[in-house]
A protein has these predicted regions:
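Residue-level detector of conserved catalytic or cofactor/ligand-binding positions
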Residues: 1
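Short, structured beta-strand segments at or near domain termini in extracellular proteins/domains
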Residues: 191-204
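Amphipathic/coiled-coil alpha-helical interface segments used
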Residues: 186-187
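Functional-site microenvironments in short loops/helix caps that host divalent-cation chemistry
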Residues: 4-182, 191-193
Length: 204
């Protein structure tokens, strides 16, 4: 079951890794095209958009014109109260800090609400974290050189890129990758209110 967000213009959330992959397989069958999750290399290439800075807009933390992350529009108290009302058990880290700016959203924003990067790609940092197709490895030493998905390492630990609307500026970085582990359920079956995915279509 996929959970739709606030409106049709918001990203779909509460999607597990397995569900995201199943959707791309269904879409491929329906259209005759090849759709899949991005690899880590593809994701970072599209997120950086030719830049070498920490984020595609530069090295400063404050990027409220470019990304929907944790900022002055939300306090820990209001966030946790809202999550409790939605039935979520999400817990904020003790050192949770927010960017010193306002992006206008407490939670997810409609797709395309912020300035895109130099490639014209929207919402690569913040809004919702995105599943990618690789197996987890803390380093990139064993990553394929051709941009394909890494198939060695811990393949039961799926990877999230881009961070989300409640993540601190520290995590809204083009290089940040997170190998997800759940204490409640099988990793690839786990859903959260800030987990989504981006689809790639192969062009022959």
């Amino acid at each position: 079951m996929l959970f739709r967000s606030i409106t049709d213009k918001h990203p779909v959330v509460c999607v597990s890794w397995n569900e995201a992959v199943a959707y791309t397989e269904w879409l491929s069958e329906e259209t005759g095209e090849t759709y899949r999750l991005l690899t880590e290399s593809e994701w970072e290439y599209s997120a950086r958009a030719g830049t070498k800075t920490i984020r595609f807009w530069g090295d400063i933390d404050e990027g409220c014109d470019f990304a929907n992350g944790a900022d002055l529009d939300i306090t820990p108290e209001s966030f946790l109260e809202e999550m409790k009302g939605r039935g979520s058990k999400i817990v904020l880290p003790e050192d949770w800090v927010v960017a010193d700016c306002h992006d206008g959203y407490k939670f997810s924003a409609p797709v395309g609400s912020f300035i895109p990067n130099n490639f014209g790609v929207y919402d690569v940092l913040g809004n919702v974290a995105e599943w990618v197709g690789d197996c987890w490895d803390s380093s990139y030493e064993n990553s394929p050189r051709d941009g394909s998905a890494r198939v060695s390492g811990n393949c039961n630990r799926p990877i999230l890129r881009g961070a989300s609307y409640y993540d601190m500026p520290l995590y809204l970085r083009s290089s940040n990758h997170y190998g997800f582990e759940s204490k409640q359920s099988e990793n690839k079956e786990t859903r959260y209110i800030n987990f989504g995915f981006r689809v790639l279509r192969e062009i022959n």
